[in-house]
């Protein structure tokens, strides 16, 4: 009888563990699917063409001070958005390249982006450089400070890599920035 009870207790414990694991795994699968859904939706989002500023989030640059393919894609997306907005609304956008200088970089990420913007035909007076930040939170905080110096009610967008849009949007929101991202 003791052996039978022990087996029943072991079976009960096994069932409890199985049910608990199924609940945990179901929760994790749901969390993963929800995260993927949010990231895909954010990456495919195109901001409204009513923006005053576009913050271009920095990333590592090449040794010669030029943009890596990843950073070039972010910058090209911002340029494309600015051109499309101009066509749609006749409203010029101000570009804010954002990113500090790494120890192994010749110039700041922001300066490298600015150089590329000018090379691509963007007028220097439409570029405000934020070159102190070392992470996405600082990109947003320091860029917001620059924007607030001229326009506290500005409509803002940001450009980053598609897989980074959702996370950057959350960080921007936590920094008190109402903006739309693109990637």
Per-range role (PLM):
Residues 36, 43-183:
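A structural signal for short, hydrophobic/glycine-enriched beta-strand patches
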Residues 2-42:
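Transmembrane alpha-helices and immediately adjacent membrane-cytoplasm interface residues
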